[in-house]
Amino acid sequence: MSLLEQVSVSKKANIYFDGKVASRSVFLADGSKQTLGVVLPGEYEFSTSQGEVMEVTSGRFEVLLPESTVWQEFSEGTQFELAANVSFKIRNTAIAEYCCSYL
């Protein structure tokens, strides 16, 4: 979905990796939470505290999923799912954006 309706948005950004990754928390009418983020070129490692679905909304990422040794490419309109309490890596060569939905 390219448009989120009837939401509340946190004014304060979540800033990671010296400002190279930034996201905003979005709270939907049903009480669920998503984050919308921008990632500058680089390689980053993240950890999850709950299950997530990461949708690439612009650009592309290469992703090293948990327990994998092969980087996989995800481009605009694609997504990948992550379990709770895992670590994964992403890398990109140009600015990319994502929408993270929590399970």
Curated annotation (Swiss-Prot):
HAMAP family: Nucleos_phosphorylase_PpnP. It is an enzyme of class 2 (transferase). It catalyses: a purine D-ribonucleoside + phosphate = a purine nucleobase + alpha-D-ribose 1-phosphate; adenosine + phosphate = alpha-D-ribose 1-phosphate + adenine; cytidine + phosphate = cytosine + alpha-D-ribose 1-phosphate; guanosine + phosphate = alpha-D-ribose 1-phosphate + guanine. The keyword Transferase applies. This is Pyrimidine/purine nucleoside phosphorylase. Pfam families: Ppnp (PF06865). One of its GO terms (molecular function) is guanosine phosphorylase activity. The lineage of its organism: Bacteria, Pseudomonadati, Pseudomonadota, Gammaproteobacteria, Alteromonadales. Its EC number is 2.4.2.1, 2.4.2.2. Keywords: Glycosyltransferase, Transferase. GO terms for cellular component: cytosol. InterPro entries: Ppnp (IPR009664), RmlC-like_jellyroll (IPR014710), RmlC_Cupin_sf (IPR011051). Coiled coil: none annotated. The keyword Glycosyltransferase applies. Catalyzes the phosphorolysis of diverse nucleosides, yielding D-ribose 1-phosphate and the respective free bases. Can use uridine, adenosine, guanosine, cytidine, thymidine, inosine and xanthosine as substrates. Also catalyzes the reverse reactions. Belongs to the nucleoside phosphorylase PpnP family. Gene3D superfamilies: Jelly Rolls (2.60.120.10).
